[in-house]
Amino acid sequence: MELGGAAGALGPSGPLLVCLCFGTLAAQAADTCPEVKLVGLEGSDKLSILRGCPGLPGAPGLKGETGAAGLKGERGLPGVPGKAGPAGPKGSTGAQGEKGARGEKGESGQLHSCATGPRTCTELLTRGHFLSGWHTIYLPDCRPLTVLCDMDTDGGGWTVFQRRKDGSVDFFRTWTAYKQGFGSQLGEFWLGNDNIHALTAQGTSELRVDLMDFEGNHRFAKYQSFRMADEAEKYKLVLGAFVEGNAGDSLTDHGNHFFSTKDRDNDESPSNCAAQFQGAWWYHSCHSSNLNGRYLRGPHTSYANGINWKSWGRYNYSYKVSEMKLRLT
């Protein structure tokens, strides 16, 4: 049957029904059907389709032209520093700079100090240094030497070259140690044979020995002159007459004798007096005094190896304090 005849046979509603039939067939051929809403069939005979089925995707269009470059972004944060690279080649020396301004005048050098500085503790005393203590003096060869000056005893001006006071320093030492000197400014010391020789070579010096026992008793011995020869003469003791002192004379017997240590035997005894009596001294055979002996703290049963002074205490008493000092006359 032709569609036109069929629509005419259905009367005034025929065209609408034909369209609905075709819509139904199309919806069955697809998975989904459009949502249809009939509006005004009785009045206006109109049909409104609110949503139809989606069509098949179209072919992709042509690629568009590249757009213009965007604006440059802001600078980012700095990254983590990398490892240091190898050192570059050394550059060439630059041009010489201009001469600088003249500096301030420096302090006087040693030669000037030697020419004008004090030579002895006696000279320091005459310059107004009245306090006992450590001072710098200058030897004849311009060497500076720090010494302990006793400005209190017997008029002052004494240079102390030996001090024993507490046993803190071992005096049983070698020839080299006595040559150079040893000990502490705060305690016990030996100034050194070379230094003692240099001090006594400046002129005539007197000698004083001060002793104190462990009961607090003080005694002394004083000699008219004192000189120590140089190492070539084995530091021989050249001693003047005993002048005074309540300690008595226990050093005259050692005059004109050589200095001996445990490793350098220059005495007149078949044995080594320094090794036997554990000291270092101008031994003959062997001694009347041994002020560089062992620190034995008063009475001792051992024989003659302490800080002994025969004329006071004999050979079995070791003194608490011993000081040997010289003064240029």
From Swiss-Prot:
Residues 1-29 form the signal peptide. Keywords: Calcium, Collagen, Complement activation lectin pathway, Disulfide bond, Glycoprotein, Immunity, Innate immunity, Lectin, Metal-binding, Repeat, Secreted, Signal. It comes from the Eukaryota. GO terms for biological process: complement activation, lectin pathway. Residues 52-111 form the Collagen-like domain. Residues 77-90 have a biased composition (Low complexity). Ca(2+) binds at D265, D267, S269, S271. PROSITE patterns: FIBRINOGEN_C_1, FIBRINOGEN_C_2. CDD domains: FReD (cd00087). Disulfide bonds join C114-C142, C121-C149, C273-C286. Residues 64-113 are annotated as: Disordered. Gene3D superfamilies: Gamma Fibrinogen, chain A, domain 1. GO terms for cellular component: collagen trimer; collagen-containing extracellular matrix; extracellular space. It is found in: Secreted. Belongs to the ficolin lectin family. The fibrinogen-like domain (FBG) contains calcium-binding sites that may be involved in carbohydrate binding. Homotrimer. Interacts with elastin. Interacts with MASP1 and MASP2. May function in innate immunity through activation of the lectin complement pathway. Calcium-dependent and GlcNAc-binding lectin. This is Ficolin-2. It comes from Bos taurus. The lineage of its organism: Eukaryota, Metazoa, Chordata, Craniata, Vertebrata.
